[in-house]
From Swiss-Prot:
Binding annotation for Zn(2+): 51, 53, 254
Phenotype upon loss of function: Disruption of the gene in strain Rm2011 abolishes growth on gamma-butyrobetaine (GBB).
Keywords tagged on the record: Metal-binding, Transferase, Zinc
UniProt keyword tRNA processing present: no
Family from the record: Belongs to the BKACE family.
Organism of origin: Rhizobium meliloti (strain 1021)
Subunit structure: Homotetramer.
Top class in the EC scheme: transferase
Protein name from the UniProt record: 3-dehydrocarnitine:acetyl-CoA trimethylamine transferase
Origin superkingdom: Bacteria
Pathway annotation: Amine and polyamine metabolism; carnitine metabolism
Length: 300
């Protein structure tokens, strides 16, 4: 994809994620009500898309419960503001080995493995306009945790998402994930317009330096739509990088807790900062209806 600034940008807000962030900021939403309210505030601040995980309301731990997804979905859809709903389908591929000398039995506390149909059950239940598809397996963070997404698993999940009329958002953590996404497209398992999220700076995928970022961008076909984000200290620099490279923007408490040095943020504040950055570059922020037209989404 040639370097060409995007002049019409949509912002995705990743509302809560599944990371161990609840104890680090009181702004991280936990209950379905909190998640939905935070998503709605992000939409009011300028996010056209909200990307939602769910958490156990009692512990804050990541969850896959259908009732939690249904409540979040219903609350967002009944709100007085329009927004494109994007649900994760990344859960159910978590494998934590025992230790380096005895990998089996696996760590039951951290391991959460499910089949393709179970991993997209909440997608079939809630029918969001978009859901994520983590397009590869990789060592994740520290210790012995592997995020597993085998080729056969990804093919079946993509097939089910497409059959449901839900647009997969390919989460690419490295260039090989883009390679496999192209294979899914060639096999007709994902359809045009293809949507990609470039996930930068997440150990141990692609680092978020600009050379690596542009290597990722250059592997995105020119007729595909992409967004990009980084986590941590470079998170609020990435809106500018993504737009300059021709892409769209993702911010949110899933990826970053701070709007400035030492300043814990809400999702709405992160979106407001992204809007300011994008508009200061001379680009236009587009809303949910324009995103639906661009991505050929089915509003629910």
């Amino acid at each position: 994809m040639p370097l060409s600034m995007n002049r019409e940008v949509f912002i995705t807000c990743a509302v809560t994620g599944a990371g161990d962030t609840v104890s680090k900021s009181s702004h991280v939403p936990v209950t379905p009500k909190q998640i939905a309210e935070s998503a709605i505030e992000a939409a009011k601040a300028g996010a056209a898309v909200v990307h939602c995980h769910v958490r156990d309301p009692e512990t804050g731990a990541p969850a896959r419960r259908l009732d939690l997804y249904r409540e979040v979905t219903d609350r967002i859809r009944s709100a007085d503001i329009d927004v494109v709903l994007n649900l994760t389908a990344g859960m159910g591929g978590d494998l934590v080995f025992g230790n380096v000398e005895s990998p089996f039995p696996v760590d039951e506390k951290g391991t959460d493995m499910a089949g393709a149909t179970e991993r997209v059950a909440h997608v079939a239940e809630c029918l969001p306009e978009i859901c994520t598809l983590d397009c590869g397996t990789m060592n994740f963070s520290l210790g012995d945790y592997v995020m597993t997404n085998t080729p056969s698993m990804l093919r079946e999940m993509a097939r089910q998402m497409t059959a449901l009329g839900v647009r997969p958002e390919i989460e690419a953590f490295d260039t090989g994930h883009l390679w496999f996404a192209k294979q899914l497209a060639e096999e007709g398992l994902i359809e045009d317009p293809v949507l990609i999220q470039l996930c930068m700076g997440i150990p141990w995928g692609a680092p978020d330096d600009l050379n690596t970022f542009m290597a990722m961008v250059n592997n995105v076909p020119s007729n595909w739509t992409f967004s990009a984000f980084s986590i941590g200290r470079n998170a609020m620099a990435y809106p500018a990088a993504a737009v300059l490279a021709g892409g769209n923007v993702r911010v949110g408490l899933e990826d970053n807790l701070y709007v400035g040095k030492g300043q814990l943020a809400t999702n709405a504040q992160l979106v407001e900062k992204a809007v300011s950055v994008v508009e200061s570059m001379g680009a236009k922020i587009i809303g949910p209806e324009e995103v639906r037209r661009k991505l050929k989404l089915t509003k629910r």
